[in-house]
UniProtKB/Swiss-Prot annotation:
A Pfam family: F-box
Protein name per its UniProtKB record: F-box/kelch-repeat protein At4g19865
Sequence ranges of the Kelch repeats: 148-190, 191-237, 239-272, 273-320
InterPro entries: F-box-like_dom_sf, F-box/kelch-repeat_ARATH, F-box_dom, Kelch-typ_b-propeller, Kelch_1
Record domain F-box: where: 27-73
PROSITE patterns assigned to the protein according to its UniProt record, in alphabetical order: FBOX (PS50181)
Organism: Arabidopsis thaliana
Residue span of region Disordered: 1-30
Keywords for this protein: Kelch repeat, Repeat
Amino acid sequence: MNFQVEPPEKKKTKNSSPPHSPPSSSSPSLSLLPEEIVVHCLARISRLYYPTLSLVSKSFRSILSSTELYATRSHLGSTEQCVYLCLWDPSYQFPQWLRLLVNPNRTLANSIIKKRRKKKKTTGQMLVPLTSSKFTSVSKATVVVGSEIYVLGGPVDSAVRVLDCCSHTWRDAPSMNVSRMNAWACFHDGKIYVMGGCQGLKDEPWAEVFNTKTQTWEGLPEPGSEVRKCSIDRSGVIEGKIEFGNVNEMCAYDTKLCKWEYCVNKSAALRSECMIENVSYGFWNMRLLWYDNDIQKDYWKRLEGLESLDDKYMRNGGSSGNTTKLVACGGKLLLLWEGYMKHNPNNRKKIWCAVIAIEKCDGGGVWGIVESVDVLYTVPISCQLLHCLVVSV
């Protein structure tokens, strides 16, 4: 998980030593090392320190923005999971993308906070807006591919925009064959599958697939009227099948057999479903549930230990009608929701975030431990939490 850590302040003493003189030209410097070694050194450092390191020199700035550095981070296994949010206010043309930083020093010690009421209470998380957000459109169809976020379509659009989460810059990818609005997308085995959103025209491919290696689009077989009419509010990849639908019906596309399936009276994957150590977690009916994929014919069970979170969720505007997102990051669950009350004179609402640690119990059970619950952002009541995505960089 990505963390923001501030170094402790050093206490000043009366007999403090005079400031050190600037290093001489003969002092050892990292910049004197071969660039390959510098890249390997920087690749082992958390990305949180990169903005400060970029001030050292132009050569450092060049290395910190290079693709070689992030390739080295991946090779060394030093990548970090980062959370990205997308907020949209209908009064603005473009959505706002933000990066979420989580503080590891925020613990369960609420009693310690109460004992130190004289000190200013600091939040465990913070959101950092990306300045390049205006280069993308509003779209439901977003997928994570490596260290990039693909935004597909928009208000009846075929364009595909890609956010490079290493440099926080946007680029264009090949456009879809069909303009789509409110489409759904999934990533599986190097390919992006896009479904729906094409205004129901039978002469247009209802679904198509994008090969991220060859950067080419290809239409999928005609799914039939039942699949076309299916109302989609969730999607996911299960055992090589692209599943989508709602609580009453489920459709699927078998990527190996290139075949469509339709099942009535069968629910699709839960909303905001994610996985930690082969245990699936989902949010449904204002409850966190879990499902062990290693147990055949297992069933969804309530995640225990979250009574305090349940109470805080309800007291701070959480409801079945509000947007709630659940993601897994760094072995923990992050639950985000829009919280606003009916009586709100300022027409504002808050974006909340709860960090939940997972503990496996004897006998195969799973327990949740609430580490922190914080307000991330205060936004106009018309603003919507569109996406919450986890990217490894």
